[in-house]
């Protein structure tokens, strides 16, 4: 049972800490000598996000649909097949109509771009978070790579392993946990881009979802849904 002091602290954090505060700008700045341009988009910019990162927004809707179907709800899993085939970035709106619940409760899409013409840093540093149905904090995408340190083909641990890590995931996960505890969010979730990433996320406490979709995704090498319970 939480003591009164802990309850008051969490209440204060809930008032002070916003989802966009999870992104640790100073920790990123400390990694480089050049100037860094930051961009953060929230729920009020969902249509901008649909244009900038349509695949990520699609994944949020797909994640909600997967959880709804796997919850045992009496619904045809193929009901939104056309939206899935088209990878409709606004599929979450269709999901909301079916489940009669709000899918996206808050968004924080954070990007960092290095002001150095010698490197192409777009996509190397970003953290895309969504507070969503049913009561999860979904890490829609995460990348903390050093564009100055490319990885040789023989050293790649997975297909998208193009640069060395900045080793910033751990401190961001700590911030995510803090945000979740303050806001009574029960789980942190994500989907891997390949099976090779599973051990890395397992080392941070994530587990593969225990459902039919996750088992099938693992067997076929698709994006595997994982979760971490917040305590």
Language model regions located:
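Non-catalytic substrate-recognition and accessory regions of acyl/acetyltransferase enzymes
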Residues: 1-164, 171, 178-189, 193-198, ...
């Amino acid at each position: 049972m939480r003591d009164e002091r802990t309850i008051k602290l969490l209440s204060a954090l809930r008032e002070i800490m916003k989802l966009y505060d999870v992104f640790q700008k100073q920790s990123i700045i400390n990694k480089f000598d050049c100037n860094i341009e930051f961009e953060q988009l929230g729920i009020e910019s969902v249509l901008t996000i649909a244009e900038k990162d349509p695949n990520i927004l699609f994944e949020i809707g797909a994640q909600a649909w997967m959880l709804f179907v796997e919850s045992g709800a009496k619904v045809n899993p193929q009901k939104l097949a056309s939206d899935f085939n088209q990878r409709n970035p606004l599929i979450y709106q269709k999901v909301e109509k079916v489940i009669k619940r709000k899918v996206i409760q808050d968004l924080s899409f954070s990007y960092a771009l290095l002001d150095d013409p010698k490197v192409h840093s777009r996509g190397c540093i970003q953290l895309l978070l969504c507070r969503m149905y049913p009561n999860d904090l979904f890490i829609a995408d995460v990348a903390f790579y050093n564009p100055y340190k490319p990885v040789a083909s023989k050293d790649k641990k997975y297909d998208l392993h193009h640069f060395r890590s900045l080793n910033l995931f751990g401190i961001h996960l700590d911030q995510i946990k803090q945000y979740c505890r303050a806001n009574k969010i029960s789980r942190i979730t994500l989907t891997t881009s390949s099976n090779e990433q599973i051990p890395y996320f397992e080392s941070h406490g994530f587990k593969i979802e225990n459902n039919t979709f996750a088992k099938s995704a693992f067997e076929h090498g698709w994006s595997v849904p994982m979760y971490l319970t917040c305590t």
